[in-house]
Amino acid sequence: MHKIVLVGLLAWVAGIISVSAETLRVVSYNVENLFHPKHDTIWEPNPNPSLKGREIFIEKDDYEWTPDGERRWSYTRYYRKVENIARVLTNIGEWDGVDIVGLQEVENALCVKRLCYTLRPGEYDFVHYESPDPRGIDVALIYKKSRVDTIATRAIRVKPTPNPSLKGRGDELITRDILYVCAKIKAKSEGVKANGDTIHFFVCHLPSQRGGVAETEWKRDAVKKILQGGVDSVLAIDPQAKIVIMGDFNGEPQPSEGGGDPGDGLRGVSYQEPVNGKETGTHKYHGRWSCLDHFYTSPSLDSLSRAEIYNAAWIQEPDEKYLDLKPKRTYNGFRYQKDGFSDHLPILLKLKIKN
């Protein structure tokens, strides 16, 4: 089993990190329920071999996020949400803008297309596949066309998986796909020779802990095995391949080798130490910060790569019950907040691209 190394990429980084002309800015962001207001449906290949070629019609369970649903999710609120997320990404990207964004919890291509247009019209494109997730939330990847050429893309399907402890009875895992994108990186500035680095990106959103951490661990383990298989397939062709895995893993990083993130043989380093005595993380639940959102890279990537949690005060709000701050969500319970963003903070990876 090939090894990939977590190199301090889920982290806080105090101070400002200087960015060279050839730094690639990669963001991972769970944008929490970015739904299109129109009820959505998808067509899926028929699993019956005798009916191969005939698609089946699947309705998404997204009625809560429609104008007549519980959230009263209007087009005005939808557009405002997209604008808010775009504002976060614009601030992370600073003057030059972000180069690549791995998104979690987007409903469909319309949402991602709208976000690309809102960021900078004409500058960004995206990769998205519909997945069988019952609620209809998927992962996607946005990229700046001037810096990235996609070579190959595919959705890695997580097949329906039974709970091993129930021996095939009861609970079954049906979840999001893993998105794979093979991309060639282009030089940022004129006069700089493009190195043509090829990087393999995996975007993930593992099943939640709803129902209990231990009780749902088998679901996340099942997805990690599929992810590890995808990584192994890349490394089997090129042992020196440059790989970036990003996403919401719905669990803390495992610092020890063989810790199970996202497959056997991992060696992980997490940066969760307090800053100025304050706890930090990407998600806060009942007053406790957790680092649920991770970056992983292969050893072949530049060791100077750095990462940080983007925790600007303006995308947070006072935590009146548990004190300090917490991510500012679009909905606080069922109370709509027009200047809300997500229940997760985004994470930024600064990759040094050699010329």
Short names for language-model regions:
Residues I100-G102, V106-T198:
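Structured beta-strand-rich core segments of catalytic domains in phosphoester-bond hydrolases
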Residues R25-N33, A152-R154, T198-S208:
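Active-site-proximal beta-strand elements of phosphoester/diester hydrolases
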Residues V5-G15:
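Bacterial N-terminal signal peptides
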Residues N108-L110, P134-G136, Q209-G211, N250-S256, ...:
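Active-site environment of divalent metal-dependent phosphoester hydrolases
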Residues R25, L173, K186, D221, ...:
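Metal-dependent phosphoester-hydrolase catalytic domains
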Residues V19-T118, Y129-I137, S189, N195, ...:
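N-terminal, active-site-proximal structural segment of metallo-dependent hydrolase catalytic domains
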Residues D40-P45, G196-K225, G229:
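Metal-dependent phosphoester/phosphodiester hydrolase catalytic core
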Residues V31, V106, L206, D248-F249, ...:
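Active-site metal-binding loops of divalent metal-dependent hydrolases
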